[in-house]
Amino acid sequence: MTKNQTISPLSIIGVISAGLRIYRDHFRSYFNIALQAYCWSIIPIYGWAKFSALSALIGRLAYYETLEQPEVISEARSRVERRMWSFLGQGILVGLIVMGGIFGLTVVGGIFVGILVAILGQNNPVTYLIGFGIFIAILFAYIWLISRMYIAALPLAVEDNMTATAGISRSWKLTKGAVLRIQGILFLGFLIILPVSILVILIIVFLPLAFGIIVNPDSSTYKLIVNLFSVAINIIIGALFLPFWQSIAGVIYYDLRVRREGMNLTTNPIKDRKSGV
């Protein structure tokens, strides 16, 4: 493909394919960044801010890879880490918005179910049916909120003169009407990592049993070894998965900008792009 061709939106499969290619081609460098991020996350507050910034750094790098305008990691890192505390504040704010929204819906749903119980009785099948419907509605509301804010860190990481709250507003604007596409992308991503996730669960379950054969399970040494290995495994697995999801986020951010704004550029995304769906 030539460099002069105008960039186009990606299909759902195209987003996944692009994210996987970026993840594969830059695995070593992204894994190193993610490993640092998870090691920093052990330290309260400052470490959490570093984790947030380094996570966003991977998304930024993936975004520019999608544009075929790769950045030098050290330069991108210095730009992102200057907003370290903004990333932490944004993460807290997003968490509060999601929890507040779900809490409000739960309270309203609980009151409504309580009224139904008072009118119809606790053992009435209609009460259970409506209660289940409210639960499903709250679950979908949670998914909707998460989808609307999934790329909130990307505008803060990429765009100039951006604040934490403006990044959330930007994500809200870009994801309008795109919740189903985003969920389709995330669902396919989940299916891709599912085998590894199952393997990790098996390791976590059987690891204490394996150590129990070597070391007395009642000893303090056994507990120390198991805890240390559990922390190490969680860090390594997190460092494996984080670049994958951030690569996907970077490509989603690119795709949404193309769809919403046209991104009047003469640069191509990575080669296996497809028409949007």
Regions found by a protein language model. Give the residues of each.
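Juxtamembrane transition segments at transmembrane-helix termini in multipass membrane proteins
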Residues: 1-7, 16-18, 51-71, 145-162, ...
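Interfacial aromatic "cap" segments that immediately flank transmembrane helices
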Residues: 3, 7-40, 71-101, 143-198, ...
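Alpha-helical transmembrane segments
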Residues: 44-48, 128-144, 234
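Specific transmembrane helices
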Residues: 55-64, 92-112
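Hydrophobic alpha-helical transmembrane segments of multi-pass small-molecule transporters/permeases
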Residues: 91, 95, 135-139, 231-238
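C-terminal TM-helix exit segments that contain a strictly Trp-centered aromatic cap at the helix terminus
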Residues: 102-114, 197-208
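Membrane-interfacial helix-loop-helix connectors in multipass membrane proteins
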Residues: 112-134, 207-228
